[in-house]
Amino acid sequence: MRYVLSVVSKTEGNFNWQEAWGHLVVSPEAAAAQVRSGDLVSTSLPEPTAFLNALANRTDLEDVTVFVPAPRKGGAAIAQNKKLELRAPFLTQILREANAHAEVVPVRLEDWGRFSVRNPPRVACVQVGTPLPDGTVPPGSAIAGNDALVRRARRDNDLVFGLVNPVVPYIHGDSFHVKDFDALIHVPLKGSMPIFDQRSSPSDLDPFIGALDDLIPDGATVQSGVGGLTEVALSRLTHKKDLGIHTEVMCQGLMDLMKSGAATNRLKTVFPNKTVFTIALPETFDFLDDNADCHIVPAHVALNHQTIADNREMRCVNLSLIHI
């Protein structure tokens, strides 16, 4: 199946989504109140923290399993409630610091959608951006496997909530619609919680940068993993020409390549003229906001092996551990 990028124009002005879609607006507590004993609850990347906190405050539940892809404060709160079982593919620093326990689910990011279809939750909650006047709901800073939670075939009594984060950018690409949700959760947020743990800046990069310079030719398509080493190293390749970007995570280093003109996406064979990703880090938000050169897509598109292989001169830069 071919995936086609859709373009939705952002509408400026004083549009109030809570007034326009008032019949759908609920509080985190009201949404969490819909969870029943015995339910499987699945959430998004990034986590819908306010919903998870409200759910963690419930003491009347039994045998409830909560899937949180990358637990932050909300996931840690779930783990502290003995009536709830936290499941996650990643055990984050916040969980470790809270001495919280979770069952590890060995599922790759590109398989989260299929995992949700095979393990359908009765209640799903995904973080989204601010709804637009035409009913379009931008995905916010990530889609990852969130699309499957929203668009999967539902059984009777299944519920899907969208927690609206007003501080994430409007990113072009895939999107939802208000009709996809049973309710939209309103919570005044002061800032966007990071998706990943803090990355440290590496030192002594010269050997690594020299190797990358030789391995990444002009016109190559680049993918970068999360990590201070790869991000900083890529940002030093601004002398390159006509690079393309097809990646899992849009990070500082890739953004710097676009800002410098080194990455133009002009020669890309898949999604030409577009930077494509499924997760955006906070340091890229201002750059991505209403930037038509950048498109967000589901993980099963960004990480599809055949799609990656079809890209021109694909180069993937990721960290690895060597045990000596």
Model-predicted segments: where are they?
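Conserved alpha/beta enzyme-core scaffold
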Residues: 2-321
